[in-house]
Amino acid sequence: ANVLIAMDDVDLGSSILEPLKPLRTHLVLADGVLTLRELDARTGQGQLGGTVQLDGRDAQALWTADLHWSGVQLESWVHQKRADNAPPYATGRLNGQARVAGQGKSTAAILGSLRGGVRMQLVNGTISHLAVEAAGLDIAQGLGVLIKGDDALPIQCNVVDLVADQGVLRPRVLVLDTRDSTLWVDGSLSLATEAMDLRVVVTPKDFSPLALRTPVHVRGSFADPSVSLEKSKLGARLGAAAALAFLNPLAALIPLVDVGSSDDAKRGGDDCRALSARIAANPVLQAPRPATK
């Protein structure tokens, strides 16, 4: 089979996500291998492209995907309804790429065996001030934001680099830097069991008398996660030795962040370079060491 496909609207199965409008691809079926080539889709004012392949020649099908996306407006792609005309929790143009593979007789089995990597960056982004203060457990500033009303903090540096192995996603680097705080995430997301075990650490750049600076754990199923504090770290400042775990991976990703001739791309690279230098120079701002069990 050799078919050119053009679809005006592809529903992603969720009322929260914007459909793909339109989607065009070249379907080729030969010798038990189904390939979608030259995939070209639009969503959230951005573009998704790449190749997807399903190889059914073995007892268990092998699924591979090499995808890239750019200019996807997060606030358009993910519907974020908030009361009292508050700004969206997060905005910006999402760029990234995914190269993954999985094997099995069902979608669940393929996801449960997924391996590869995903990289993303949010350009010209903002994040809810209230969300940042809540993640950092800054009670004083959080109350102030509640009283005055939420506002959008510009994101200075945002890098996501996920590694997939046997259906488990782990952040090699997941950092979000604003003028207010730097947020780091480590842990794991299991596509096989649909469970998560994440740790979120926020290092504030300002002084607040009620900032606990306590790592937050998000654990449980995707459908019903629970949030708890890391008791052993309650009230403790992050130590100088904690930074180096994420510093080198962040520095290695900066050339990828800095790709492109646009002012936005250059600014993103400069901001992430500044964050990397600040981590190396100032222990108070350093990244947390990945949790060990």
Name these PLM-found stretches.
Residues 248-249:
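Gly/Ala-rich hydrophobic membrane-inserting helices
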Residues 1-239, 243, 255-271:
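Small-residue helix/turn framework positions
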Residues 252:
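A small-molecule sensor/coupling module
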Residues 257-291:
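Membrane-engaging insertion elements
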